[in-house]
Amino acid sequence: MWKHLLSGGLKVEQQNASAKKLILSVLNSTATKREARDYLTKYTRSDDSKQLNHCLLLIRHLNSLRQHEISELTSTVKKLGMLGLRPIFVIPPSRHIAKQAEILDIITTLAGFRPLQLQNSLSQSIDGTYTSILSSQNAILNNHELEVVPILKPYVYREKDASEFLTNDFTKFMQNLCKGNNTHIDKFFILNRIGGIPSNERNENSHVFVNLSQEYDCLKKDLKGQVDLLIERRPRTESLLHKLELHLNEDAINTLENQFKEHLQDLEMMNVVLSNLSSSATGLITTIESAASSSEKKNPLIYNILTDRSLISSSLPRFKKIRHTPPSGSRPAKKFHRMTYLEDYQQLDKSSPPDSALVTTVFKKGIDIKIFDYPKLTQFNSLSLPVEFRVKDSPQTNPLHKIDLSKLKGLIDRSFKRSLNLNHYLHRINGNIASIIVIGDYDGIAILTNEGPNDNPFVYLDKFAISPEMKGSLCISDIIFNLMVKKFPKELLWRSRNDNVVNKWYFQRSVGVLDLSIDLGDGNQTKSNFNLFYYGEPKSTNYGFHNLARLKEYAKHIRDIHPSWDK
């Protein structure tokens, strides 16, 4: 499928048949055409290109690696080079720096590179400012012929007294290391024994994707709270039994405390590093075991280089099982699909290693998100509003942000390749808007409205649009979908034409699908080429496909919505 894209010649650090075979293998099984083109544009170079692409690679607990893990990690590092990405190793501060440097030296050499151990990664001038070795040694690091891979030790050289010291603030060290350097770093990988940032929503498995600009503060607060709770060592009650319980579990609590401290530091480092790299840079935290996987389809590092995303989508429901039974009291119909939640990626064999998708978190610096909860659009909360929708009464307070209807319409027109009749559209939705979500500079939007009976409305996703040039990048679709289901967890509905190429994506994220041409009873049937999709609480008897009367309300109101396109 991708051979024609490679026909112009692939120039990477180790150009050979193995490299092409590796790339074709992964692209054929995982990547879209857009992702393949993006990869080839970013990581293949012409003969006169002076830029080398690098990844920062931090491996924790190196001194505990077993021989087979060293061998498998060596294979992964070699593949990084084949794919056009040269590693820069960073050693975390510990008592085992010399041993860890020795192991990295072996890995680098066996992977076909020339290791270069660098003692003082930072220099502190007399005025207290820092200079990164990534800047001062840029000419060597970017030399194509030398094939040098630096191994950076966590020491700082202090000009004031011509001394060196081991950093006592690794997060600050990483921040200064990446600040203002000329070395092109596109990825930051952290490998450890505990995996990515834990998520309560995923049964303590790792977050799949983190948009740092949106989620960092909340995640840091949660992790800090867990650390403080473990440090406090408070028994459940003051009874002797519970105090004894605490004492007997001291070792386990210590282990858990250290793990959460590590998670917290990993998150903080990811934030400061990505803040100093380009907006397109990606971070990833996973286990050493996953990163050492020989399967390119399951190795999160290899997969991310080729697709710039996580192994699974972050907006997929965690639990889903398909059933083909209609609700009680209705006639069987092939056009009805109902689903209930079942543990997705369920770990049946607890002794086997966890799936890489469960222990990997992908990070982006993130993009701006604005959520407008204006039921009605007026000239006071929007720009480019048609005159007929202006109101006389001014609000008591003016909103800080306004919806730009010109940009909103432009995005919808480009995304759907049709022209939206804004006046017709506003006549239908104005006054019934549940929320409008805007990503970046109108790179993505979701318009949600209140539909159905006045006394019992439901939330309907009326428009979901992503800028064509941004599709597949920055996980915008996943970000919007996650925001919607968190904001409206009980009921969220939308419709899509039967031949829409996005229907597979919709189907995977819904818990119910209904063909809107179905007979709703009493002769209530209309020809329709739309499917209805439902997301909501699976155990609720008041909402969703468990309630036949409510299901009919969904179907009738959504089926009968008239589109607002120019003819």
From Swiss-Prot:
Family statement drawn from the similarity comment of this UniProt entry: Belongs to the acetyltransferase family.
One term under GO cellular component: NAGS/NAGK complex
Keyword Acyltransferase part of the UniProt annotation: yes
Source organism phylogeny: Eukaryota, Fungi, Dikarya, Ascomycota, Saccharomycotina
Location of this chain's protein in the cell: Mitochondrion
Residue ranges annotated for the N-acetyltransferase domain, each copy included: 392-558
GO biological process, any: L-arginine biosynthetic process
Keyword Transferase: yes
Native species: Vanderwaltozyma polyspora (strain ATCC 22028 / DSM 70294 / BCRC 21397 / CBS 2163 / NBRC 10782 / NRRL Y-8283 / UCD 57-17) (Kluyveromyces polysporus)
Record protein name field: Amino-acid acetyltransferase, mitochondrial
Protein keywords: Acyltransferase, Amino-acid biosynthesis, Mitochondrion, Transferase, Transit peptide
Catalysed reactions listed for this entry: L-glutamate + acetyl-CoA = N-acetyl-L-glutamate + CoA + H(+)
Main location: mitochondrion
Record-level Gene Ontology MF annotations: L-glutamate N-acetyltransferase activity
Its job: N-acetylglutamate synthase involved in arginine biosynthesis.
Pathway(s): Amino-acid biosynthesis; L-arginine biosynthesis; N(2)-acetyl-L-ornithine from L-glutamate: step 1/4
Domain of life, per lineage: Eukaryota
InterPro entries the UniProt entry points to: GlcNAc_Synth_fun, Vertebrate-like_GNAT_dom
EC assignment: 2.3.1.1
